Regions:
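Short pre-catalytic strand/loop immediately N-terminal to key active-site residues, enriched for Gly-Thr
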Residues: 51-64
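Conserved phosphate/ATP/ADP-binding segment of small-molecule kinases
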Residues: 1-50
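Charged C-terminal helix
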Residues: 98-131
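Short, well-structured alpha-helical segments that form the helix of a local strand-helix-strand
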Residues: 19-27, 83-97, 112-120
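Short glycine-enriched, charge-decorated loop/helix-capping segments at active-site entrances
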Residues: 11-16, 58-59, 104-106
Length: 131
């Protein structure tokens, strides 16, 4: 969820720090993975580990973007990925696809369809990456 959705689910938080701590608490209590969407999307594991994503941009705060992310993560689960790696890879690829969409046009005009259209290129870029 994004911050407003999270607050509706788990109660209002006055700061992002408070929200992150509440997300850790909820992930541990309910043994769930929480993907807290935002400028640096956080993935919180059932053990309370917090991982921050480095890909993505402000233009991705658009209708349908979260649905696209959910579809990407569930698609990875359907392929046999374990839940935590599926969340991490899904969030990163989603952000990378958004970055590619922004490079192609402009982050001010990104739609969910633009993100979807760049998923293949994001995979290709990731496969070609060398450490």
């Amino acid at each position: 969820p994004h911050h407003l959705e999270f607050d509706r689910l788990f109660g209002k938080n006055d700061t992002s720090y408070e929200r992150l701590n509440k997300a850790r608490e909820m992930a541990i209590r309910y043994h769930i993975i929480i993907v807290l969407k935002g400028a640096n999307t956080a993935i919180i594991t059932p053990k309370g580990d917090v991982l921050f994503n480095s890909s993505g941009n402000a233009g991705m705060a658009t209708a349908g973007s979260g649905d696209t992310l959910t579809g990407m993560i569930t698609g990875l689960l359907a392929q046999g990925y374990h839940p935590i790696p599926a969340a991490i890879l899904g969030v990163f690829l989603h952000g990378m696809a958004g970055d590619l969409a922004a490079e192609k046009d402009s982050q001010e005009y990104i739609t969910a369809r633009d993100i979807i259209s760049q998923i293949g290129q994001a995979y290709k870029k990731l496969h070609n990456y060398r450490v």
